[in-house]
């Protein structure tokens, strides 16, 4: 098993993450891809003299770019991409490999990502009609969540475990997404290529950062919405694409009724104007990128038979309203 960590200013959390992987009950090969960090996380890691392969990049390629860089340096049949702010249960790799053995039909196995308090980060992913994605069971106590071993849409982006053959069939992540929704678009391609994901509740990973650190942010909103729209144009039936403005407006209205938070996850003041600007920028950029997305759509429809029909079935199978 090869495990690749994406690092950007990970501080001491990076070293802790590497140590938890090297402490597994089965051997794993650990790689670290540094996205031009400005802190001392890589220097501190080197001082520990740990058995890991470090790739230092001169510029920040974003999450997807770093994932692609790691994939180019991985050779194992089972591969993992993950954030640096994680701590892996000592039996995680063993449980994960056992699940892969039990499910030879699965291209990926999703871990149970949770806080040490027992709050779940994600079990799977569910979708709204406009491709709005929500992590299944996010924020629930583990006693309240459905954590049966079951088929899910794909892995939570914090830690993705997959067979090499599945990643090769899906192709590279789209580095132009930079942040957010890139793993969702990628896992649509996994599904379209015929590779399913099984959720393994025994494979436990602890997410050290509270989810609130990234929950409300105009920057996150911009990238999430822009990349959601780009993915919708690439994959959904055109009848659904034409409905995106209306469905998006309905969702924004529903969210607005719930109230706008007073501050973002990093404690900065958050205004309705900043949210509206982020949404407007996302839609304008998505519109500007439309010619490119239509070209990608043609490529996907050539590569994956009945791509739009299959994408529609995926939405129905993992619907928020199910």
Positions of predicted regions on the chain:
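Glycine-rich, basic loop-to-helix element that forms the pyrophosphate-binding segment
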Residues: 56-74, 84
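Short aromatic/hydrophobic "clamp" motif used to bind/position activated sugar donors
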Residues: 79
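Conserved donor NDP-sugar-binding/catalytic core segment of glycosyltransferases
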Residues: 87-128
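Short, flexible, basic/aromatic active-site loop/helix in glycosyltransferases
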Residues: 129-152
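A short, conserved alpha-helix in the catalytic core of glycosyltransferases
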Residues: 153-204
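A conserved acidic beta->alpha catalytic loop
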Residues: 20, 34-43, 59
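Short, acidic, metal-binding catalytic loop of nucleotide-sugar glycosyltransferases
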Residues: 19-28
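Active-site-adjacent helix/loop segment of glycosyltransferases
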Residues: 4, 193, 197-294, 312
